[in-house]
Amino acid sequence: MTYEAQSGPVEALRDITFGVGRGEFVALVGPSGCGKSTLLRIVAGLRPPTAGDVAVDGSPVTRPIAQVGMVFQAPVLLKWRTVLDNVLLPAELAGLEAKRYRGRAHELLQLVGLGGFEAKLPRELSGGMQQRASLCRALLLDPPLLLMDEPFGALDAMTRDEMNLELLRVWGEGSGGAAGSDRKTILFVTHSIPEAVFLADRVVVMSPRPGRIARICPAGLPRPRTVEARASADFGRLALEIYDLLTARPA
């Protein structure tokens, strides 16, 4: 993937090839500027690749598609709309009758602990609550693939840990979440090695720009994940392996 900058062509990604299985949780880690966010935008159909191709469910991605939901680092909630109306926005943008999705919107908000906040404005919510609303919005049309671009990066450490557990619960690791084959496929970008190891089935480690795959590391940790998993020897070994890959200097 090459794009034009003021200083000339910039190669953001090179020779990226990997697949993600249905219902799998895959994390992407790498140094700043290695193309992680660019890769997500290509998968989402927001940016066309300059070489190669991307497919979702076997179909090439050439434009934004309904099968993909996206959550950004900032919640990007419209400040003049209520929480409920923000969650319903994807239905409106897709030309669908929003009132048909009100029931699902209420269910999602209840699932993430925002029941009773439907009529609130974004400014009345904490950062973590805003990000919960953003997650509900991405899930409204029930996309099988969820792309998450550092969604918890701006949160404090304790709220971030809470959101990690909340995400796993919604994904299907706890009561009330999806089960088995109903789980979403998630591609999750983060700068946090512990977050990647805690959440993912596999961690894709990327090299500096142009971003390439340095290694794909299976997490190998049992599910459901618990807070105690962070203290396990296997967790520490994998986190250290990824850290060594990211800090390795070329010979």
Describe the residue ranges of each PLM region:
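ABC family nucleotide-binding domain
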Residues: 1-194, 199
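Active-site/binding-pocket entry motifs
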Residues: 2, 222-223, 248
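Short hydrophobic beta-strand elements within the C-terminal catalytic ATPase subdomain
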Residues: 56, 205-206
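Short, glycine/charged-rich "phosphate-handling" switch motifs in NTP-dependent
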Residues: 202
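Conserved beta-strand-loop-alpha-helix hinge in the C-terminal portion
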Residues: 206-238
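Extended, non-globular alpha-helical segments
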Residues: 239-251
